[in-house]
Amino acid sequence: MAIIKKFRIKSYKKLDTIIEFENVSLSYGNRLILDNINFKVNKNSIHGMLGPNGAGKSTIFNLITGLIKPKSGTIRIFGEEVNNYPVYTRTKKFKTGYCPQYGGFFSDLTLHDNLKAISEIVIDNKNYRTEKINNLITKFEFENLKDIKAKFLSGGQKKRLVIALALLSDPKVLLLDEVYAALDVLTIKMLQETIVNLQQENQITTCICDHQARDLLATCDVAMILNNGKIIAEGSPSDLVNNIEAKSAYFGDSFSIK
C-alpha cells in the first residue's frame, strides 16, 4: 500500500469541479443549519470537512446524496444542477457512493455474501459480478475474512467492508462519514492508505467528514471547517492549522500538525 506522509500538504492540481455548493442554506424549523455556504470539490481530490457536532457536516452529505433538499441555493454535480434529482438518480447518473458512519452492511451475512448481495443489485453481468467481488477481496485483503459474518468483524474491518460495498458500483465520487471514528491508530493508518490508494489508482474523488482532525488532515488535499452553519476556513492542512479563526473556533491554540 501507499505510504502516507505525516500530512498531505500539497493539493491536487486538477481544477475540474465535481461538486459545487452555491449560496446553499438549510433550516430545520427555526434552526438555521447551513447559512449561505459556497464551496467546490475538485476532480480526484480528497476533500475534508471538520467541525463540532451540529456544524452541518453530515447535512452536507445528505444534500449531496439527495436525502434532503436545500431551502435555497444550488447544488451541482459534474456541472449539472441536481436540486430536484432523487437519490437513485444521483447515485446512478453521477456514480456517487456513500459510506455511513454506522451500519451500511448486512450483519447476519458473511463478508462475501454482503458483496454478493449488493453486486446483484448494481451489476447486471454475472461474470463481471464474480470478477469484481474477487478483485475487491484481493484489494482489501479479505481472503481470511470472507466467510465471517459481518457482525463479528472488527470496527476497522467493517469500515473497509462498507467502502468495498460502495466500490461495487465503480463510483466516481465517494462520501465517507466519520470514517475514522472509534478506531485504533493502526486501523486508522490502514484506512488512510486505502483512501489515498483509491485516489491514486481509481481516480476517485473523495469527501470525508470526521472529528479526528489530525487523521483527516493527514489524508486530505484540501479541507474546510464549519461552525454555526458557515465555512469559517478552507485550504490545505497547513493553511488551516495556521488560520486564526480556525484555531479560535475549532483547533485551539495548542493544536499542531508536527
What is each PLM-predicted segment?
Residues 65:
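Helix-to-loop junction immediately C-terminal to a conserved catalytic motif
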Residues 50-52:
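The feature captures the beta-strand-to-loop junction immediately N-terminal to the Walker
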Residues 149-153:
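Conserved ABC ATPase signature
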Residues 73-82, 92-93:
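Conserved ABC transporter NBD signature motif
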Residues 178-179:
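Walker B catalytic motif
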Residues 127-145, 196:
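Conserved ABC ATPase "signature" region
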